Amino acid sequence: MEADILDGKLKRVEVSKKGLVNCNQVDVNQLVPIKYKWAWEHYLNGCANNWLPTEVPMARDIELWKSDELSEDERRVILLNLGFFSTAESLVGNNIVLAIFKHITNPEARQYLLRQAFEEAVHTHTFLYICESLGLDEGEVFNAYNERASIRAKDDFQMTLTVDVLDPNFSVQSSEGLGQFIKNLVGYYIIMEGIFFYSGFVMILSFHRQNKMTGIGEQYQYILRDETIHLNFGIDLINGIKEENPEVWTTELQEEIVALIEKAVELEIEYAKDCLPRGILGLRSSMFIDYVRHIADRRLERIGLKPIYHSRNPFPWMSETMDLNKEKNFFETRVTEYQTAGNLSW
């Protein structure tokens, strides 16, 4: 096929020249040829998980919430959980759009980031839907990060990892800048989505396991399914940047990352104590000390760092829940079937 060569200097993309960051040799607008098959697989898996909160019936949750069958301590856990997640998902989405996307120079990785940003919006929608369904004070829930010290501390911690990256003069071309960018990725993928969120999932899914607040529980299952992919993408992205830029992975940077995770563990334990001043549903705040440390070790190992806590997992059932390859179909209880563009009725 004949082609009009508009610019003789521009050539078709060579896969070997693609890079995750600082790649100016290829056109970032050309998806193919795909180099990072893991990024494309994460994108496809994300697309296979399409869902909306409004597809989940909330009648049983509404009935239970309006009754006197839930204790005040159980209500406290639910409200503080919603209070954290309702704005945390927005922080993650904003970080993708404003801090991460522009520094990633690979189109298939960007393709997934666009998908993830959409999912974060769906998750934020979820917490609004829950508030509206239960008749909660939306201002109280969505402003909890300004009113609850344990939530504010976690969000402030996350924002410290975004400030430098949002500076208009920030660049990942230097080792210092790239190291700061990696810390941002660790902060949001490893810590926020891989530690803070998982602790929250345990709390709400514990209700679901006892047939309480099942509508909320089902939505959290969907979110967990999304977040598992987010976490895996983030780990692959961090490891990919390390592999392509080995000079940035210094002992100093590794120590800084370990210190960040240690601080995150402390913050999450304090949050768990705030949520659970007394035990409910077989949960005690002391169990979250072990759990948060356990998953922190797993996250450290996934990015090539040594575990530091060696704690047991007090919630082994979460391993099954997190397994994306399990036979259970999370979407079998949906009110409506998801329709792709190809079969919508006009």
From Swiss-Prot:
EC numbers for this chain: 1.17.4.1
Record's keyword annotation contains Heme: no
A single GO molecular function term of this UniProt record: ribonucleoside-diphosphate reductase activity, thioredoxin disulfide as acceptor
Active site: Y129
Binding site for Fe cation 1: E89, E120, H123
Keywords: Deoxyribonucleotide synthesis, Iron, Metal-binding, Oxidoreductase
Cofactors, names only: Fe cation
The keyword Iron appears for this protein: yes
Enzyme class: oxidoreductase
Free-text remark on how the cofactor is bound: Binds 2 iron ions per subunit.
Pfam families noted in UniProt: Ribonuc_red_sm
Domain of life where this protein originates: Bacteria
GO biological process: one example: deoxyribonucleotide biosynthetic process
Recorded catalytic activity of this chain's protein: a 2'-deoxyribonucleoside 5'-diphosphate + [thioredoxin]-disulfide + H2O = a ribonucleoside 5'-diphosphate + [thioredoxin]-dithiol
Binding site for Fe cation 2: E120, E193, E227, H230
InterPro entries listed in its UniProt record: Ferritin-like_SF, RNR-like, RNR_small, RNR_small_fam
Family to which the UniProt record says this protein belongs: Belongs to the ribonucleoside diphosphate reductase small chain family.
Subunit structure: Tetramer of two alpha and two beta subunits.
Function: Provides the precursors necessary for DNA synthesis. Catalyzes the biosynthesis of deoxyribonucleotides from the corresponding ribonucleotides.
UniProt name for this protein: Ribonucleoside-diphosphate reductase subunit beta
Source species of the chain: Chlamydia pneumoniae
Lineage of the organism: Bacteria, Pseudomonadati, Chlamydiota, Chlamydiia, Chlamydiales
